A protein has these predicted regions:
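Membrane-embedded alpha-helical bundles of multi-pass enzymes
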Residues: 1-140
């Protein structure tokens, strides 16, 4: 698979992920959104799988936390540029979770549906987060 195709699949996953959370009501998308990025990460070295997972996570969290820039600017007194940089920093940090998730799931010899069911909640439990934006919050 070409690199451009893999990037497109990771971006697609990142766009679909936030649609499964409150406000949209498309809760199955939080599981379905992982399919394109898992296809992109298939048969890759762990560091490459991590990159695609990280891209997916960055976009997904930005979709969910775009409001942070306004909060940083309005209540934190930051300039708009610093507010957006702060938002990207938070989304990058949180995107690490998806980087690790996709790396682990792509490297396990189990079918992705089984490994996702165990690895995703385990990582969410272990990974310190700022806001409760875990998969359980989407399953309403």
């Amino acid at each position: 698979m070409k690199t451009r195709t893999r990037i497109t699949l990771a971006v697609l996953s990142g766009i679909l992920e936030p649609l499964g959370f409150a406000g949209f009501g498309l809760f199955p998308l939080t599981w379905i959104a992982k399919v394109p990025v898992l296809l992109a990460a298939r048969d890759l070295a762990p560091r490459l799988a991590f990159r695609y997972g990280m891209l997916y996570g960055l976009i997904a969290y930005f979709g969910g936390y775009h409001w942070l820039a306004h909060t940083f600017s309005t209540f934190g007194g930051l300039s708009p540029v610093l507010a957006w940089l702060g938002t990207m920093l938070v989304c990058s940090y949180l995107g690490l979770l998806f980087g690790f998730l996709i790396t682990l799931v792509s490297q396990l010899k189990l079918p992705p549906v089984w490994s996702l069911a165990f690895v995703n909640p385990a990582l969410e439990l272990l990974f310190p987060n700022i806001f409760p934006y875990n998969i359980g919050a989407s399953q309403h």
